[in-house]
Swiss-Prot record:
Name of the protein described by the UniProt record: Vacuolar protein sorting-associated protein 55
Residues bearing the modification Phosphoserine: S137
Organism encoding this protein: Saccharomyces cerevisiae (strain ATCC 204508 / S288c) (Baker's yeast)
Lumenal topological domain residue ranges: 33-37, 98-107
Cytoplasmic topological domain: 1-11, 59-76, 129-140
A Pfam family recorded for this sequence: Vps55
C-alpha cells in the first residue's frame, strides 16, 4: 500500500495560509463594518487550546478513556475550560449581533474566522504530535 507523506515544511506553509485566512475573515468583519468588537473573538480562540496544552504537557502517553477507574482531574478541567472557551468564541458574535453591536454578515464572518483560527491551531498540534527525530527531515 502506498503511503502519502507530506514534508513538515509543506505542513507549516499550508497551516500558516489557513491561519491567515481565519485572521483575515475576523479582521475584515471588523474593518468592513467599522466595528471592532469581533476582535475579542480572536483572543478567545487563541486562548482556547492553552488549558489542554498546559495539563497535557507532562502526560504525553496518557489516553483518555471515560470507562477507566483512574481519574485525572487536571485533564478533565482542561477539557472543560477548552470547551467553555470554544463555545464562548462561537457564542460571542451571536451575542454581539443580538445586542445589535454588529451586523449579521460581520457575525457570520467572525464565527467562521474564529473557527478557522482554532482548527488551524488544533491541526498544527495534531500534525506535529510525533517526534521530529523520525525519518522526516525539515525539507523532505
Amino acid at each position: 500500500m502506498m503511503e502519502f507523506k507530506v514534508s513538515p515544511l509543506t505542513k507549516i506553509i499550508s497551516l500558516s495560509g489557513f491561519l491567515a485566512l481565519g485572521f483575515l475573515l475576523v479582521i475584515l468583519s471588523c474593518a468592513l463594518f467599522h466595528n471592532y468588537y469581533p476582535l475579542f473573538d480572536i483572543l478567545i480562540f487563541l486562548l482556547a487550546p492553552i488549558p489542554n496544552t498546559i495539563f497535557n504537557a507532562g502526560n504525553k502517553y496518557h489516553t483518555s478513556d471515560f470507562m477507566s477507574d483512574s481519574s485525572n482531574t487536571g485533564q478533565d478541567l482542561a477539557h472543560f475550560l477548552t470547551g467553555m472557551l470554544v463555545t464562548s468564541g462561537i457564542a460571542l458574535p451571536v451575542v454581539f449581533y443580538h445586542c445589535q453591536l454588529i451586523g449579521h454578515l460581520s457575525c457570520i464572518m467572525c464565527m467562521i474566522g474564529g473557527l478557522i483560527i482554532y482548527s488551524s491551531i488544533v491541526i498544527f498540534k495534531w500534525f506535529f504530535k510525533k517526534d521530529f527525530n523520525e525519518d522526516d527531515s525539515l525539507f523532505g
